[in-house]
Amino acid sequence: MTQSTFGIEEEYFLTDLTSRQVARRNVEAFATACQYELGERVTREMFAAQFEVVTPVLHSLTDARQCLEGARRALARLAREFDCGVLAAGTHPLGQWRRVRATDMPRYRAIFDDYRMVASRSVLAGLHVHVGVAEGVDRIRLMNRLTPWLPLLLGLSASSPFWNGRPSGLMSYRQAVCDEWPRMGIPDHFADEAEYQRYVQVMTDTGCIRSAANLWWNIRPSLRYPTLELRIADACPRLDDALCLAGLFRAMVEHVQLTPHHAWCDDPLTRVLTLENRWRAKRQGLRGLFIEPASQRLLTFATWLEEVLERIAIQVPASDRWILEHARNLALHGGSAEAQLAEYRGARANGLEHGEALHQVVDSLMAQTELHPSQQLA
């Protein structure tokens, strides 16, 4: 099988360097500068100070690294011209949703009109990965097989332990906010793409949704491209984490295209167990115990991850084998959410006030996002 093409979308918060809050000043000027220098590679999101980088179709993680490194550095340089920085994380540690301005575009006005406070509270940033699916392959049947693994990808990416300027008690509070929306979270089960299309037809014919683009599940078939789109992952401050997740999801998609379908994937119990595992990943990140959905054994995150890595490793090209060890290291040493909380607690233990400690966390996240050398993993 030819290696699948893929694409990555990363979301960032423009951050005021004085207040460390989500920026309110110079946002439109920054957007204009981005448009001039980066063109269609950067798009506006629901909130004025939120931006997304969209890669072209990619063939390797090397290409992805080059593309995203260039984009992150360009955004950081442009942001400094307006006394701002850029920050990638599932939530902004100092983000106050009541203070964040919406983007004044027809598409987003319609969303805010439909979903009201649910939309207004969703000051969130995600990592989305599209992976191409071979022609003639039923994407829904693939989605059914991939869905039980989604909690692993959430745990690896979790980077949103803070909400509204305080620790939330969750490793991915972003997913907690997502649960306020309809048609988010773990997708409903459909037997195949034909059944899924019937559902979309009913929902659009009755005016419940404008199009399949209003199905925001943690994984979904793309409306515009012949891809499956991963949506569960929090935005990653460290580029290596984002690339690792993209490579793992690509390998997972290739694996399920090449191996036989298993009946347990269609068992209603599997979806219920996946919901439980998603909660555990949202709450505990890489810690705690998870229910392996096929055998229903209770496993540590690291043990479950290792079992999945052993299955998909053959799909990872030699140049990308580093992602396997990187994922293991995250499971062993912790990801972004744990690092943010450790930095916050350390700052408080050293005598900093609550707000000052959060400033320190924001500074670290900006340094990681902007690829400052001292913040990159060896």
From Swiss-Prot:
GO biological process: modified amino acid biosynthetic process
Record field: catalytic activity: L-cysteine + L-glutamate + ATP = gamma-L-glutamyl-L-cysteine + ADP + phosphate + H(+)
InterPro entries xrefs: GCL_type2/YbdK_subfam (IPR050141), GCS2 (IPR006336), Gln_synth/guanido_kin_cat_dom (IPR014746), YbdK (IPR011793)
GO MF term list: ATP binding; glutamate-cysteine ligase activity
Keyword annotations of the record: ATP-binding, Ligase, Nucleotide-binding
E.C. numbers: 6.3.2.2
Keyword ATP-binding carried by entry: yes
Family, per entry: Belongs to the glutamate--cysteine ligase type 2 family. YbdK subfamily.
PANTHER family, sorted: GLUTAMATE--CYSTEINE LIGASE 2-RELATED
Function: ATP-dependent carboxylate-amine ligase which exhibits weak glutamate--cysteine ligase activity.
NCBIfam families linked to this entry: gshA_cyan_rel, PRK13515.1
UniProt name for this protein: Putative glutamate--cysteine ligase 2
Organism whose genome encodes this protein: Ectopseudomonas mendocina (strain ymp)
